[in-house]
Amino acid sequence: MDNDGTIVDVTTHQLPWHTASHQRQRAFAQSAKLQDVLYEIRGPVHQHAARLEAEGHRILKLNIGNPAPFGFEAPDVIMRDIIQALPYAQGYSDSQGILSARRAVVTRYELVPGFPRFDVDDVYLGNGVSELITMTLQALLDNGDQVLIPSPDYPLWTASTSLAGGTPVHYLCDETQGWQPDIADLESKITERTKALVVINPNNPTGAVYSCEILTQMVDLARKHQLLLLADEIYDKILYDDAKHISLASIAPDMLCLTFNGLSKAYRVAGYRAGWLAITGPKEHASSFIEGIGLLANMRLCPNVPAQHAIQVALGGHQSIEDLVLPGGRLLEQRDIAWTKLNEIPGVSCVKPAGALYAFPRLDPEVYDIDDDEQLVLDLLLSEKILVTQGTGFNWPAPDHLRLVTLPWSRDLAAAIERLGNFLVSYRQ
């Protein structure tokens, strides 16, 4: 009705939003900064798996290191402590994390031989290591800065480097040498724009545990070129046989080193998202960078508080992971079965993992003519309802590897690898 009392037909009266609806709608595209950001562990093939599950199919997920679905439960003492702490975990904490948890991190590394001393102000807690990696690279990198990352790698490092405007540069690890980093290749990749060196040890996806000699050579190169050291050591307690883990910071007490670790794997609480970052070495020339990490920590307000209460009891209590990796332990048994069964498949070879939760088998190109390993993974999913991840998803340059987690029960793991072998016998692209 108009002001003069006349009834208006709203079906023909041109209202502003009515006119706009006849115009071309504005498109909202993905940001250009995501153009080079990939995370194939939960990529397109994972979406196909979700569709199959919705249709009622049972999918054996060997694509992600998530212990809980395979019957690996957190120690009871961790669960009890979190439940008891819930009434006190309703508000925000300090942006770096609660003091008791940060003290527990400091105490943990006092027991690591040669690890440089640091205090609670050098510790940042995070919603898993993943958040802390992203924060660190956002605080560090300007457009075009280069970060040396192993190939194969845990792809979050490459994705987060690209997201921060940096350029990931991959140095090769040598399969013939147990997946140890190729020092000559690493040195050849260093340029004036190189800012940091990422070391993933024990390695995901290969399971390699780096020798003291290799780590020393890597540190020597970083020292020569004044590179920041970024040490991803989330699997440092998941070691098999006589493997010994050496923390990178312990070899480089004179260098700025950021060590990343957390509860997700060794303490089987991946869903809690409880990680930490410890900064060691001389900090006087990195105050602005560290201030940037603090700024980003403030912006996210704080890590989730209930999970922070798991850190002190986890680090100070019985280390139950040892029961799983020593002789008779479930993780060791499953590692052995995966390695043995994979090497029994004609044309497939696998370096024996010395740590972590994965196998990274090679498909001999002389036997398997694979041009597209993502298509191979999709075809395996559709045929066998087994979900793995293609090797190129870990920034390996050739389509000749797969990554499988070794978390399923031995019987299920052996059956899955047997089905993989049967599938490969007749597979053609």
Curated annotation (Swiss-Prot):
EC number annotated for this UniProt entry: 2.6.1.2
Residues the record lists as binding L-alanine: G65, N204, R403
One function term, GO molecular function aspect: L-alanine:2-oxoglutarate aminotransferase activity
Catalyzed chemical reaction(s): L-alanine + 2-oxoglutarate = pyruvate + L-glutamate
InterPro entries, per database record: Ala_Aminotransferase, Aminotransferase_I/II_large, PyrdxlP-dep_Trfase, PyrdxlP-dep_Trfase_major, PyrdxlP-dep_Trfase_small
Modification N6-(pyridoxal phosphate)lysine, positions: K265
Necessary cofactors: pyridoxal 5'-phosphate
Keyword DNA repair attached: no
Keyword Zinc-finger: no
Gene Ontology BP terms: biosynthetic process
Compartments, record wording: Cytoplasm
Keywords, ordered alphabetically: Aminotransferase, Cytoplasm, Pyridoxal phosphate, Transferase
One annotated Gene Ontology cellular component of this protein: plasma membrane
Main location: cytoplasm
PANTHER family given in the database record: GLUTAMATE-PYRUVATE AMINOTRANSFERASE ALAA
Subunit structure: Homodimer.
Family of the protein in this entry: Belongs to the class-I pyridoxal-phosphate-dependent aminotransferase family.
Designated name of the protein: Alanine aminotransferase
